[in-house]
């Protein structure tokens, strides 16, 4: 079981540099490359810190390449020798230490949108994340189903059809997560039954959004056959069990409950908490003492 956190490291006080279109227009792709290299250097620094602190699961930032899919960015960044050199270093560490690395595209990457242009841009973003995760030696691209658009069953079908039309490389890495407002665990399992996408279970989202049906963990586990160790998300509500907002830390109660329901199932757990690595470290140490 590997425990991890997402993107930023509060102890290192890391930041990932972004770029405005106007600045890119004025300074050219050289500026995009400059910031990209700094972001990869930050990622490498975090990877080293994680290894020093026995954290073997990490979600890389989606913002490593500024303006990654914007038309102004005509830089073939994934083939740039400097990018290849630093990502080779990152990937070597990831592979040598069996660290799991994932990415999580943002809310505007919506495969099941009824608007073809939104789907087109979503696929572009997934292609960017696919290139990024391959260079980093990662394995997972986490995505939500999207919107219901007044007809949840049709929305599920659209997601499945869009998924099946993706490149084999993206399909190999894409995992579908239940969300906290619209698509329950049962819903994403329904989508899996259409297109075989693995299901990333988020226990806090389930607490906030469920139909009262008990979670079938064996069914979730089965969706990962051929895709490696299941990935699970955990967070604690800021002011209550079903508060959609994330607390700075994950509570001992919530973590122990997840371990209880998992039983003998081996899974990697992503902590989604405002205090990032600080939320993970106590539980890493706890597991190491067992």
Regions found by a protein language model. Give the residues of each.
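Short beta->alpha junction loops/turns
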Residues: 148, 180-181, 276
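Short acidic, Gly/Ser-rich segments with clustered Asp/Glu that frequently serve as metal-coordination loops
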Residues: 183-184, 204-210
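Residue-level "edge-of-site" marker
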Residues: 63, 106-107, 146, 205
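Active-site groove signature of glycoside hydrolases
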Residues: 136-150
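Multi-pass alpha-helical transmembrane bundles in non-GPCR membrane proteins
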Residues: 152-163, 174-178
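Alpha/beta catalytic barrel-like cores
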Residues: 1-100, 107-122, 130-140, 165, ...
């Amino acid at each position: 079981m590997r425990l991890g956190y997402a993107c930023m490291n509060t102890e290192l006080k890391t930041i990932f540099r972004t770029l405005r279109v106007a600045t890119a227009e004025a300074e050219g792709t050289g500026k995009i490359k400059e910031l990209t290299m700094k972001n990869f250097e930050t990622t490498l620094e975090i990877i080293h810190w994680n290894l020093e602190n026995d954290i073997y699961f990490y979600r890389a930032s989606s913002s490593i390449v500024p303006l990654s899919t914007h038309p102004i960015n005509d830089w073939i960044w994934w083939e740039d020798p400097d990018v290849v050199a630093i990502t080779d270093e990152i990937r070597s560490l990831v592979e040598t230490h069996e660290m799991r690395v994932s990415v999580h595209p943002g809310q505007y990457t919506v495969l099941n949108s009824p608007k073809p242009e939104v789907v087109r841009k979503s696929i572009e973003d997934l292609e960017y994340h696919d290139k990024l995760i391959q260079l980093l030696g990662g394995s997972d691209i986490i995505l939500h189903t999207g919107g219901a658009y007044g007809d949840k069953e049709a929305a599920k079908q659209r997601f499945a059809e869009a998924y099946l039309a993706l490149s084999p490389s993206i399909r190999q890495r894409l995992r579908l997560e239940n969300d906290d407002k619209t698509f329950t665990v049962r819903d994403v399992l329904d989508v899996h039954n259409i297109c075989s996408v693995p299901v990333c279970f988020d226990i806090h989202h389930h607490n906030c959004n469920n139909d009262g049906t008990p979670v079938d963990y064996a069914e979730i586990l089965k969706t990962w056959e051929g895709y490696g160790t299941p990935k699970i998300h955990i967070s604690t509500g800021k002011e209550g069990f079903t508060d959609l907002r994330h607390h700075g830390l994950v509570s001992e109660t919530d973590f122990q409950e997840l371990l209880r329901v998992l039983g003998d199932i081996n899974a990697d757990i992503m902590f989604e908490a405002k205090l990032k690595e600080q939320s993970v470290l106590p539980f890493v140490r706890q597991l190491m003492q067992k």
